[in-house]
Amino acid sequence: MRILLVNYRYFISGGPEKYMFNIKKMLEDNGHEVIPFSIHSNKNVETEYSKYFVEPIGSRDATYFEECKKTPKVIWQMLTRSIYSTEVEKAIKKEIKDVKPDLVYIIHFVNKLSPSVICGAKKMGVPVVLRLSDYFLLCPRFDFMYNKKPCEECLTKGYRTCIKKRCVKGSLFASVVRVFSMKVHKAMNIYKDVDAFITPSEFLKKKLIENGFDENKITCIPTFTASKSEVGKPQVGTYGLYFGRVTEEKGVDTVVKAYEMMPDRHVKIMGDDTTDEAKRLKAYIKEKNIKNVEFLGFKAGEELEEIIKGARFTLIPSIWYDNLPNTALESFQYSKPVIASNIGSLPELVLNGVNGYLFKPADAQELCEKVALLDDDAVVKKMGAASRAKLEDRFAPQTHYDTLMRIFESVRRK
């Protein structure tokens, strides 16, 4: 099968891109041809198909809109990429005409490529499968968050709530643009052209169905990770570990506050420590003279693996509807118990008392109580083994591949 893989970045910057390159390799290992469509960036992995890529908003050095100079051209690009880009439609139709894919598999496109990738593919008669990594179809700011708490007012009171509260980046302009684009897409009925939706979690699938999406078009296929037997043996480490984005919705401040109350225990926080939230938390730690919370910064490769191996357990303290984070699967891979917030998809990953513990989001005191439950080495080993078993049972690469191929074959036959 020849598959056109669409994502607005062709380099690893987060979970969706890790998935993109992992699924690309898996499909190719199984004899399929995978062809990318993306946006030019100086960070991109090299590919002969970059000649079909479109120019970014701003410069090829910028990853985020905030890094771009706000020239009239950049603002116009931002508007068209948010609403509908004829430039992108023309580019993807050109690539489809030349490479003749059997289907298009879309990972991320919002605000960078626009849903013209969907329309362009359908105009060329090619079926479209869309994987959802967040809540962009339902929430203007993608994460159902307002004022550090889950918020679904746009679903119950309408999208004017977003404009009133300036939910998108705290900006009236950005909020108006995002709401307007969602209304345009709804009026155009763009998502009717999607032949199948893939969700990583049952939680996201349920949200879509509750809000009018066709249940028959939605399949939950959890993210996968490779099962490495040489790193899967349970080891009892000496510290708690948070690894991932250090941003407000990830709830890292709950970890800091909990360990402030547990000065005899040690926690490491691994992730980009230059974010606004990381700077705020590091300043708090310095002000309060907290000695047992260690920021490691971003780590990768063998260094990342060794830090996870050395952990006693890992922490996922999210305060948003986290949508099957890769960090959970990586924890399972290394046979680590996970202490996670009882929110979003996390209860699908952590069975309380079996492979970890759940606690009330943002409740530092309850987090302390759950950490204390893992003082017993035997419990840590048992729960770590349960994490590994869950990985191999539900998140194995072959399971993901088999389910995905059933979807691909079904949309081809339509």
Regions found by a protein language model. Give the residues of each.
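N-terminal subdomain of nucleotide-sugar transferases
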Residues: M1-Y49, M124-P127, E260
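Acidic donor-binding loop of glycosyltransferase active sites
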Residues: K309-N323, K336
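Donor nucleotide-sugar binding/catalytic pocket of nucleotide-sugar-dependent glycosyltransferases
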Residues: L137, T156-E230
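A conserved mid-protein helix/loop that constitutes part of the nucleotide-sugar donor-binding site
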Residues: K18, R245-M261
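Conserved acidic donor-binding segment of nucleotide-sugar-dependent glycosyltransferases
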Residues: N352-G353, Y357-A364, V371-A378
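A short, well-ordered alpha-helix in the C-terminal region of glycosyltransferases
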Residues: E366, V379-R394, H400-R406
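Nucleotide-activated donor-binding/catalytic signature segment of Leloir-type glycosyltransferases, i.e.
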Residues: K279-E302
